[in-house]
Amino acid sequence: MTTKKAYMYVLECADKTLYTGYTTDLKKRLATHNAGKGAKYTRYRLPVSLLYYEVFDSKEAAMSAEALFKKRKTRSQKLAYIATHQKEKKNH
């Protein structure tokens, strides 16, 4: 039995705001957002682009990561987290 990967992702909207979510199919979810069928928040801020994502072994882990990420209230706090974690990915 294989476990399905899950993703916590961050989108940058056309108005430069950030949207955070989780999914088990990142490519499909991004397409859904850009088709105007995703979250209400992104529907009116199209197009959106994938800014960052993390891979997890379960949906629950991705949901937890999303909740923790959303505790960062300011854009600068969120971008600092992304910058730090992207550097860590490159160093592995």
Curated annotation (Swiss-Prot):
Gene3D superfamilies with a match to the protein in the record: GIY-YIG endonuclease (3.40.1440.10)
PROSITE patterns in the record: GIY_YIG (PS50164)
UniProt xrefs under SUPFAM superfamilies: GIY-YIG endonuclease (SSF82771)
Domain called GIY-YIG: residue spans: 4-80
Disulfide bonds: none
One Pfam family it belongs to: GIY-YIG
Family to which the UniProt record says this protein belongs: Belongs to the UPF0213 family.
Protein name: UPF0213 protein SpyM50708
Organism: Streptococcus pyogenes serotype M5 (strain Manfredo)
